[in-house]
Each structure stands twice: as C-alpha cells, then as structure tokens.
C-alpha cells in the first residue's frame, strides 16, 4: 500500500476541493497527517464563522477516513527532527520549525512528502512527490 505524508498547504487545498489534490490523494492507500499539520490548519480557522465551521467539519470528515492516520510527535520523529536540523544548519538553509517536524514525520515513516513548499527540497534525505 502506497503511503504519503501531507503538508498543511496540500491539506488546505484538498479540503477546499481543489481537483489536483483530490487526484493526488487517490493515488495513495495510506495518508499520514502529522499532528503539527492539524495544529497549523486549526490556527487558520476559528470554527465560529460559517466558513470556519465548514472547514472544521471537512477536517473531521477527512480524519475519520480509514486511509488517514494522525501521527503524533514521538521519539522517532524527534530523532529525525534533530538530524534535519543538523543538516540544514550545516547547509546554512533555515526552514521553519514546523516544517522540520513535518519532514521528520515523513522520514520516520519512510514515506514521501506531498507539499508545495519549495524549501522542503533543501532536505536531501527527504523524498518529495
């Protein structure tokens, strides 16, 4: 079964109904969502407006799918986070901390990352789709 980790920007576009992302998700039998992605998503919606309630419901529906798994930050992810940090520091290429956690989740699960953020390309050990 093909597995992919999703970044926040992709999740937002998928939940907004963008066709390109719906087809991208159809290619995978297992979709991993790092906890930090959910946190970032929730920062962008308050759940109090009609649009916010719709976004919250869309997220809940998505997370309830059998192929979707919410991934907490654990020891494996922490080890990979430290490695990503060291590599980026040596390269002199800073990346937002949350994105290092997202990359660490993909690396700890041996899965590629689906993202539109170009700075993930600065991580040579990370596979992107």
Show the residue positions of the predicted features.
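Short, well-structured N-terminal submotif of metal-dependent ribonuclease cores
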Residues: 1-37, 43-61
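Alpha-helix capping/helix-boundary segments
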Residues: 10-11, 37, 77, 101-102, ...
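Short, structured coil segments at secondary-structure junctions
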Residues: 27, 66, 123-124
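Phosphate- and divalent-cation-binding pockets in alpha/beta enzyme and binding domains
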Residues: 40, 80, 122-123
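Active-site neighborhoods of divalent-metal-dependent phosphate/nucleic-acid chemistry enzymes
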Residues: 43, 69-112
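Acidic, PIN/NYN-like endoribonuclease modules and their adjacent C-terminal/linker elements
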Residues: 103, 107-129
């Amino acid at each position: 079964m093909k597995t992919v980790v999703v970044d926040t920007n992709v999740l937002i576009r998928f939940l907004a109904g963008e066709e390109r992302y719906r087809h991208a998700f159809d290619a995978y039998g297992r979709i991993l969502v790092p906890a930090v992605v959910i946190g970032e998503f929730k920062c962008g919606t308050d759940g109090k407006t009609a649009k916010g309630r719709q976004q919250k419901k869309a997220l809940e529906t998505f997370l309830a799918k059998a192929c979707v798994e919410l991934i907490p930050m654990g020891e494996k992810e922490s080890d990979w986070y430290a490695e990503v940090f060291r590599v980026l520091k040596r390269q002199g290429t800073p990346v937002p901390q949350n994105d290092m956690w997202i990359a660490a989740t993909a690396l700890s699960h041996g899965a590629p990352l689906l993202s539109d953020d170009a700075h993930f390309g600065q991580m040579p050990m990370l596979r992107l789709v």
